[in-house]
Amino acid sequence: AFSGGTKFRNGDTIMARITPCLENGKTAKVDVLDEEEVGFGSTEYIVFRAKEGNDPDFIYYLVTSPVVREPAIKSMVGSSGRQRVQTDVVQGLKVRVPDLEGQQAIASVLKVLDDKIAANRKVNENLLQQAQALYKDRFVDLNPFDGEIPMDWHLGTVSEIIELHDSKRIPLSSRERANLAKIYPYYGATSVMDYVDRYLFDGIYLLLAEDGTVVDSKGFPILQYVEGKFWVNNHAHIITGKNGFTVETLYLLFSLTNVQSIVTGAVQLK
């Protein structure tokens, strides 16, 4: 690892060093540059480059593992909301590293799993697109009803169809989470940030990003469909349906609703 942090090339792993990006899992292996091309960027990440005799894929999986992530998160210093990883702490970590053959064997197994996850994600995305198309056709474009709202329907407000559970949210700092067993997912605004040994919710819920990264590039809200036992910090709205509206229906509704016009804030979007 080196702290200059603004240059990278194919094979390097880049890890966010500022909160909440690191907790949100912002780490990637670079593979989009041309041969010999060098990338430049922000100083808000750390670049990891495999030394000779080490496997770049193994380095990536090592950096994304708790072995590196957890000490990095615990080392964060700075004002609230702008805390950064201390690169010297990361550089000083002692880790067990197998020989090159062992590294390649480990990385190969993990890559196969990643490829399967990516394939499943594509299937899910395709199914979601089909569901969105059906929902839009019936409830937005009203095609089955010749474009007219049926007489027994009415225009209402979101409050008529959702229950908000935000009052039950309890944020846990990275230091508080560091010593907890990794059992239940701990959600942030956009993704699983960590795992903890306790939970606040049990069931099927819709999480809608409240601040930070709240919309995608087209202005649609960042949503997470979650099921089971989990914990949520205070950066996501926690939603269930009422009056006959399921969480699945709400997901489709919000995923097709552009909210850019109601997003506020210059630096911290909300």
Predicted features along the sequence, with ranges:
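Generic recognition of stable, solvent-exposed alpha-helical segments in well-folded globular domains
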Residues: 9, 13, 54, 58, ...
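Low-complexity, Lys/Gly-biased intrinsically disordered segments
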Residues: 1-6, 17-24, 154-200, 211-212
